[in-house]
Amino acid sequence: MNPLVYFSSSSENSHRFVEKLQLPAIRIPIAGAREKLRVEQPYILLVPSYGGGSPVGAVPIQVIRFLNDVHNRSLIRGVIAAGNTNFGDAYCLAGDIISHKCQVPYLYRFELLGTAEDVANVRKGVTEFWQRQN
């Protein structure tokens, strides 16, 4: 199965969610990586939303840098976003932005650490997504 590529800040919320999925995954480095992450196969991006509800800063800078690499951007096939409902209309805004800019489907959104139901839905959805692609 193709991997999830994900970003998680030092809070580790997204990382903990990805671990629960028990799916192949590659983490975008937080900072200070000597080499840029370069993927070699199609992937689904899992991203947290930041910015406190503002479109400015909603997508983490590390994710922007990763997607600014034309090769990495060419392999994205879908996006999943985490967010905080306290952001109101901007809940999971990073997913909307990436889906629109990269022209890929917005597959799922969940709040903060996600629930057991979110984990099951994402695991099932990702598996079915890749089955349809092959």
Curated annotation (Swiss-Prot):
<comment type="function">
    <text>Probably involved in ribonucleotide reductase function.</text>
</comment>
<dbReference type="InterPro" id="IPR020852">
    <property type="entry name" value="RNR_Ib_NrdI_bac"/>
</dbReference>
<dbReference type="GO" id="GO:0036211">
    <property type="term" value="P:protein modification process"/>
</dbReference>
<dbReference type="GO" id="GO:0071281">
    <property type="term" value="P:cellular response to iron ion"/>
</dbReference>
<dbReference type="InterPro" id="IPR029039">
    <property type="entry name" value="Flavoprotein-like_sf"/>
</dbReference>
<dbReference type="GO" id="GO:0010181">
    <property type="term" value="F:FMN binding"/>
</dbReference>
<protein>
    <recommendedName>
        <fullName>Protein NrdI</fullName>
    </recommendedName>
</protein>
<comment type="similarity">
    <text>Belongs to the NrdI family.</text>
</comment>
<dbReference type="InterPro" id="IPR004465">
    <property type="entry name" value="RNR_NrdI"/>
</dbReference>
<dbReference type="Pfam" id="PF07972">
    <property type="entry name" value="Flavodoxin_NdrI"/>
</dbReference>
